[in-house]
Regions:
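A short, polar/charged loop/turn motif at coil->beta-strand junctions and beta-hairpin connectors
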Residues: 45-50, 67-70, 707-709, 723, ...
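Extracellular/lumenal mature domains of secreted and surface-exposed proteins
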Residues: 705-791
């Protein structure tokens, strides 16, 4: 509670970057970006491959069909005359614009120095003129380097007179407003007070210093009056001279020492009215105050229930006021008020009484809306109300009775970690901040684990086995391709992002780093500790295991590096070497053939301390940082099939590469946004390098193919008893990039992973041709598909709803997980058995395995098979069957 997760997110982000001095050096990132822009090899590589956006494109769906969330937004602003044009700002994902009410989105800030956006201002009569204040108001994921201006509707951006010297300051940009009467006046609030321009942003004056102003609004009819709410020295401040001078507003407000943060809202329904929302020092609800005389006098409207907590009735304490605090008032009714914190509450009487409007998981009978509201805003053109929150953007056109997620198309996901399949092309799984773990299976993204998603792995021999995790090392495993996950974690807590890896020759062996290194030899069913307090109770950050000798294992904790050569019986401290920097280790690489060759990557801003190499097993180290920029390196990966030992490095300024014959080159190639790269992985079957970014989603890059193609594939089912028969083909080819399928029935396809429907009985051979730069390969499976009315049917239920009509029923019926998997939670699905010409059906169960009744009950209270006497589930029920309660209807 009380913003714990938000703090841990920030700590995880900032700690490796400032270790060990604890000094934020945001200016270093800016300086290195400028240096890269001027360098000859900036954004260039031969051949000039480009990065491709992988997604998520649309908001990933949970098993219930509900949208999980795509990424955090700070701001929502509107066009002055067109209600269909919307602008949003993402703290790590940039400026986005929609001209069709959120159906489609485009961004134009990918190559700014820093793409974080805290707020946006639009000219009241010339919407081609816009301003953004850079950075992250609420979370600190990005720093602010000042205000940018657009003259072409947000297509391009230029610097203004307000730019922060980030080599010596670390300011947060919070709000930016344009005077609706005189648009040459620009008011900007920051963590260091208020700045004012009277010439359209060419020059700024610092008019209010030393106060962190996080909320700010103009009076709706008199632009000389501006209200501001602060965070720290918390109160409401007011200017009556258009932002030139500021004073604490009126009487009746709480003491500044009693409150943590304030938020302001005004309404055109009554220009004299202004509301102020306060969070207390516990980050819960302190009170809502109202002034009806332009802020001269204030009245407490309510101080309960706790509008900023997690519960459905406001009976809890605390909240996240320091991180999410939002307030808006209807432009047509001064008494309709919305408050946003973790959830959203609504009042119809000016904030005296409250009803829960939305809840972070849909509890209490309220609508579901993603947690953590950062801005609530009414559009005065159509009276729709919008929420910018940790999941994206929501809109209500009925004053909050219902809400719609319109975040599809916002590529703003903040990935922590990534796992790729080596058997199925483009199958990936990734852990994200705020929105859980996402699985991409071909074209679709699904939300498969909640919480904050962390490290992910897909078994390199079986794509149906995959792993995800949430904070502090709660590792989850799926054996059915991500349909369901269950915890396999040992009883310990790890780092916020806990490292774990599969053994590189036996995927049933798993290593997980907590304060001790745990090893499982049975896929996570049981664990043993193989260290002896080497970290002194501190938690591990990185792990790697030798592919050629699994007894050789390395792990790190901050700058400390440990190694075993005997499977954990004894450990040595490699960090005692004076040649290694005292910086957080962010990546460990052991060569797949020669375990004496080891690479390390480091975070921090120290000059030329990014990558170190050892060719003697860690006894000595060579600094190979070369021309790398002095910014944090976050991950490192080796191309294992490249004889030149090509390595790729993910940094706060994109991706760099080098091999044994070259120095470092940046391969952003004017296509990868200027964003933090948090993890890199190579998928050898597709020959792609995948980059998980912290703010712009997942990207891929085609690597040079150095081997001849190898064609191969598998199918989900090959024996059918009825028509039509649909087969899903999974391409497992390597070193290839184009394909031709011959399904044996006169039909072909060039899709990577096609689905084909056979219309006639028979046996069919299937051939796949796989082409690549170094040739073509083919494979044929003779008589692979067998369709005959005499076959025994093997039926797998759909994930939900109605499946196929079965005209023959001698065989096996599996739940959605198949023979070895688990079904979804709350899964209701069915098939219809309808043999041709039959007027009666007898079902004999030869083997039956469904969960038994619990709690001593004599009926099936959880999972069961139910049979209906008719064509659908509205027909009379013939009985429910589970485990010992079986029979033949």
């Amino acid at each position: 509670g009380k913003g714990w997760k938000q703090f841990k997110r920030w700590e995880n982000f900032i700690e490796p970057r400032v270790y060990p001095q604890g000094i934020i050096q945001s200016g270093q990132l800016y300086n290195e970006y400028l240096r890269l822009e001027l360098s000859n090899n900036n954004f260039r590589m031969l051949p000039p491959n480009v990065w491709t956006q992988v997604g998520p494109d649309n908001v990933p769906l949970e098993g219930s069909g509900r949208k999980r969330g795509i990424g955090r937004l700070n701001a929502i602003v509107f066009h002055p005359s067109d209600p269909n044009t919307l602008y949003v700002g993402a703290p790590a994902g940039g400026f986005w614009k929609s001209t069709d009410s959120g159906q489609n989105w485009n961004s134009s800030t990918d190559f700014l120095t820093n793409i974080g956006v805290s707020d946006i201002a639009v000219h009241p009569t010339n919407p081609d003129t816009l301003f953004i204040i850079t950075g992250d108001r609420d979370g600190g994921d990005t720093y602010s380097y000042g205000v940018m201006k657009s003259y072409d509707g947000g297509n391009s951006w230029q610097s203004t007179g307000l730019s922060f010297d980030i080599s010596s300051t670390y300011y947060k940009g919070n709000r930016i407003l344009m005077d609706p009467i005189n648009p040459n006046v620009i008011i900007v609030s920051t963590s260091n007070g208020v700045y004012r321009s009277i010439d359209g942003g060419d020059n700024f004056t610092h008019t209010f210093t030393g106060i962190n102003i996080v909320s700010m609004e103009f009076h709706t009819t008199n632009s000389n009056i501006i209200y501001a709410g602060s965070k720290g020295s918390t109160s409401v401040y007011k200017s009556v001279d258009n932002g030139v001078t500021w004073v604490q507003s009126g009487s009746g407000l709480p003491l500044t020492t009693d409150v943590r943060r304030a938020c302001i809202s005004v309404t055109s329904a009554n220009p004299n009215v202004v509301y102020a929302l306060f969070g207390n020092n516990d980050n819960g609800f302190y009170g809502l105050y109202k002034s009806s005389d332009q802020g001269d006098n204030w009245t407490l409207q309510s101080n309960s229930p706790n509008l900023l907590g997690w519960s459905t009735n406001g009976s809890d304490s605390g909240g996240q006021a320091w991180y999410d605090l939002a307030l808006t008032v209807s432009p047509i009714d001064e008494n309709i008020v919305f408050v946003g914190g973790v959830n959203c509450w609504k009042s119809l009487d000016g904030g005296i009484n409250w009803n829960l409007n939305t809840h972070w998981y849909g509890g209490g009978g309220a609508n579901y809306m993603h947690a953590d509201e950062h801005m609530l805003q009414y559009n005065t053109l159509d009276n729709k109300v919008y929420s910018a929150n940790d999941g994206g953007l929501y809109v209500s056109d009925d004053h909050g009775t219902s809400w719609t997620d319109i975040s599809d198309g916002l590529h703003i996901t903040q990935f922590y970690k990534l796992g790729v399949s080596q058997t199925v092309q483009n199958l990936v799984i990734g852990g994200t901040q705020d929105n859980g773990t996402f699985l991409k299976d071909q074209l679709n993204w699904d939300a498969v684990i909640g919480g904050d998603g962390m490290e992910c792995i897909i078994d390199y021999t079986d794509e149906n086995i995959m792993y995800g995790s949430i904070y502090y090392g709660d590792i989850r495993k799926s054996t059915n391709g991500g349909n369901s996950f269950s915890s396999i974690a040992p009883s310990n807590n790890g780092s916020w992002v806990t490292p774990y890896k599969l053994d590189k020759t036996d995927p049933n062996i798993i290593y997980a780093g907590y304060d001790e290194l745990y090893k499982s030899t049975d896929g996570g069913s049981s664990w043993n500790i193989i260290t002896n307090n080497e970290t002194g109770g501190s938690r591990m950050d990185q792990i790697d295991i030798s592919k050629s000798n699994s007894d050789i294992i390395l792990f790190s904790e901050n700058a400390n590096l440990f190694k075993t050569a005997d499977g954990g019986l004894s450990w040595s401290d490699l960090s005692s070497s004076s040649s290694l920097p005292n910086k957080t280790i962010t990546g460990i690489l052991i060569h797949p053939v020669n375990p004496n060759r080891i690479w390390l990557s480091f975070s921090g801003y120290s000059s030329a301390e990014k990558v170190y190499f050892s060719d003697d097993g860690g006894s000595s180290w060579l600094n190979i940082s070369g021309s790398l920029p002095n910014v944090p390196a976050n991950c490192i990966v080796l191309n294992e099939i490249d004889s030149l030992e090509t390595i790729y490095l993910g940094t706060d300024l994109g991706v760099f590469t080098k091999d044994s014959t070259s120095n470092w080159n940046n391969i952003n190639n004017i296509s990868l946004p200027n964003v933090i790269v948090s993890e890199l992985e190579i998928q050898y079957s597709s020959n792609k390098l995948f980059a998980a970014t912290f703010g712009r989603g997942l990207w891929s890059f085609d690597l040079q193919i150095t081997s001849s193609p190898i064609a191969n594939f598998n199918v989900d089912d090959s024996i059918f008893c009825s028509l039509p028969a649909t087969v899903n083909f999974t391409n497992t080819s390597s070193y290839s990039n184009s394909y031709l399928w011959d399904f044996g029935d006169g039909n072909t396809s060039t899709s990577v992973n096609p689905s084909h429907t056979y219309q006639n009985f028979g046996n069919y051979s299937v051939t796949l041709f796989a082409s690549g730069p170094l040739g073509i390969d083919s494979i044929t499976y003779s008589s692979l598909i067998n369709i005959s009315s005499s076959n025994s049917c093997i039926v797998t239920l759909p994930s939900s709803g109605q499946g196929n009509i079965q005209t023959a029923c001698n065989g096996t019926l599996f739940d959605v997980g198949g023979p070895n998997g688990n079904y979804y939670d709350n899964c209701n699905s069915w098939i219809t058995i309808e043999p041709n010409g039959a007027d009666q059906i007898t079902l004999n169960f030869l083997d039956f395995d469904i969960e038994a009744p619990s709690g001593g009950l004599s009926y099936c209270n959880w999972d069961y098979l139910e049979i209906f006497d008719g064509p659908d589930t509205s027909a009379p029920s013939l009985g429910q069957y589970c485990n010992s309660l079986t029979g033949s209807p």
